[in-house]
């Protein structure tokens, strides 16, 4: 009897350990893992990522806005690729996962967040920073719509060789 109780206890402990280390499901941070103060996260460099600007809309004159643009991009992340660490303090964004699976490492969640095709996530707020990884061998594709300034739009323009 003692052996089976011990075995069950060890199995339960291992299950709890793996559950704590496993990414969150359903594309959002579990309520009990949401942080009220942002944590430090790794400063990751981008690996295997390509970005294509699909459209840019000048918001000049709309509700008194000037110098800001609504931009939509397509990002393709290679298998085992990384979207670098970046902030959304001053750049609201909505990301839609078109294809594949990504894991987000966020300053406001104590566990990694798993995102799958068909899911979306808002990105904005003081202290909001994150990086994404593609844990699979297959490419992942997302669209990202954000509000950016003229300098950011200029960075998106193709460089002309003269």
Walk through the language-model features, giving the residues of each:
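A short beta-loop-beta micro-motif enriched in histidine and acidic residues
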Residues: 65-68, 80-96
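Short beta-strand His + acidic residue motifs that chelate non-heme Fe in jelly-roll/DSBH
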Residues: 85, 104-105, 123, 129-136
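Bacterial N-terminal signal peptides that target proteins for export
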Residues: 1-10
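A short hydrophobic beta-strand segment most commonly corresponding to one strand
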Residues: 137-153
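Glycine- and acidic-residue-biased ligand/ion/polar-headgroup-sensing regions
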Residues: 88-109, 119
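Bacterial N-terminal signal peptides
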Residues: 9-19
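A short, N-terminal "cap"/entry segment at the start of jelly-roll beta-barrel domains
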Residues: 5, 23-71, 112-114, 156-162
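Short acidic-glycine-tyrosine-enriched beta hairpin
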Residues: 77, 108-127
């Amino acid at each position: 009897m003692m052996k089976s109780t011990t075995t069950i206890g060890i199995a339960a402990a291992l299950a709890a350990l793996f559950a704590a280390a496993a990414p969150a499901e359903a594309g959002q941070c579990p309520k009990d893992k949401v942080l009220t103060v942002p944590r430090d996260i790794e400063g990751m460099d981008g690996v295997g990522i390509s970005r294509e600007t699909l459209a840019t809309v000048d918001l000049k004159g709309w509700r008194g806005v000037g110098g800001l643009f609504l931009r939509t991009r397509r990002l393709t992340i290679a298998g085992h690729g990384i979207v670098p660490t970046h902030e959304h303090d001053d750049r609201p964004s909505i990301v839609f996962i078109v294809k594949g699976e990504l894991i987000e490492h966020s300053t406001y969640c104590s566990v990694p967040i798993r995102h799958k095709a068909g899911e979306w996530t808002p990105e904005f707020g003081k202290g909001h920073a994150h990086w994404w990884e593609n844990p699979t061998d297959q490419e992942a594709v997302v669209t990202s719509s954000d509000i950016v300034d003229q300098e950011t739009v200029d960075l998106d323009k193709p460089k002309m060789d003269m």
